[in-house]
């Protein structure tokens, strides 16, 4: 299972939110590159980089940070936050992203999102299916759509999508444990999908459980920044899997 630390960016700084609420912002580090290098030094190979300014303004903003981390580490970066146009994707990939995550666009403009899957390949495009009471949430979680989560994922699986990041908003940034039941349900109803669990990870013991469920990866944010899970523990998990 991939261990994928998260770096969320506002104003070029590394922050965390609770339940996606911009008013709960805590700045953890002024220098995201420093944070990324620290992850890499502990054997981490993947990074989930989110442009929260971009998510709010519906266009890519913090691509310079992406460029910096991609050029000065070997981390495989998936980048998301407000990607809406072909130009946004071009900038993201040219700046060094390995994959991009599209969430709101997949709900609001499925034609464009499907074109991306065809144009860039299913290994490059991740479906960001953020859930609120098993409905899909969009626009940095400021809106809830009418889309039911599992049919939404199944529909895109039929279009060729392979990777899905699912964040249960009720859990995100709350350090209350992940949505094991929700992930088990998704995995049983979408055979073959590479599911990346996100939101609520709070202790190291949850990681083997997610691996056992069959998750492809797990994104860890606040638990790292608040030392609930140490980088040493992650390093051992990566080495021993």
Swiss-Prot record:
The keyword Isomerase applies. CDD domains: HisA. Pfam families: His_biosynth (PF00977). Keywords: Amino-acid biosynthesis, Cytoplasm, Histidine biosynthesis, Isomerase. Signal peptide: none annotated. The active site is at residues 8, 130. It catalyses: 1-(5-phospho-beta-D-ribosyl)-5-[(5-phospho-beta-D-ribosylamino)methylideneamino]imidazole-4-carboxamide = 5-[(5-phospho-1-deoxy-D-ribulos-1-ylimino)methylamino]-1-(5-phospho-beta-D-ribosyl)imidazole-4-carboxamide. InterPro entries: Aldolase_TIM (IPR013785), His_biosynth (IPR006062), HisA_bact_arch (IPR006063), Isoase_HisA-like (IPR044524), Isoase_HisA-like_bact (IPR023016), RibuloseP-bd_barrel (IPR011060). Pathway: Amino-acid biosynthesis; L-histidine biosynthesis; L-histidine from 5-phospho-alpha-D-ribose 1-diphosphate: step 4/9. Its EC number is 5.3.1.16. The keyword Kinase does not apply. One of its GO terms (cellular component) is cytoplasm. Belongs to the HisA/HisF family. This is 1-(5-phosphoribosyl)-5-[(5-phosphoribosylamino)methylideneamino] imidazole-4-carboxamide isomerase. It comes from Flavobacterium psychrophilum (strain ATCC 49511 / DSM 21280 / CIP 103535 / JIP02/86).
């Amino acid at each position: 299972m991939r261990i994928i630390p998260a770096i969320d960016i506002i104003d070029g700084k590394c922050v965390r939110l609770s339940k996606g609420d911009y008013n709960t912002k805590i700045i953890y580090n002024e220098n995201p590159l420093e944070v990324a290098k620290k992850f890499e030094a502990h054997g981490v190979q993947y990074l989930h980089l989110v442009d929260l300014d971009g998510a709010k303004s519906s266009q890519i903003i913090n691509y310079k940070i992406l460029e910096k981390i991609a050029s000065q580490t070997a981390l495989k970066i998936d980048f998301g936050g407000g990607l809406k146009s072909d130009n946004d994707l071009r900038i993201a990939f040219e700046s060094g992203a390995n994959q991009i995550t599209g969430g709101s666009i997949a709900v609001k403009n499925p034609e464009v999102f499907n074109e991306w899957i065809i144009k860039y390949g299913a290994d490059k495009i991740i479906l960001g299916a953020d859930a609120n009471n098993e409905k899909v949430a969009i626009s940095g979680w400021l809106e809830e759509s009418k889309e039911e989560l599992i049919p939404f994922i199944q529909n895109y699986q039929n279009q060729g999508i392979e990777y899905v990041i699912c964040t249960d908003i009720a859990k995100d940034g709350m350090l209350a444990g992940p949505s094991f039941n929700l992930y088990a349900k998704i995995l049983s109803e979408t055979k073959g999908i590479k599911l990346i669990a996100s939101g609520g990870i709070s202790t190291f013991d949850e990681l083997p459980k997610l691996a056992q469920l069959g998750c492809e990866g797990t994104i860890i944010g606040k638990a790292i920044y608040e030392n609930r899970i140490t980088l040493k523990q992650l390093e051992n998990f990566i080495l021993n899997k």
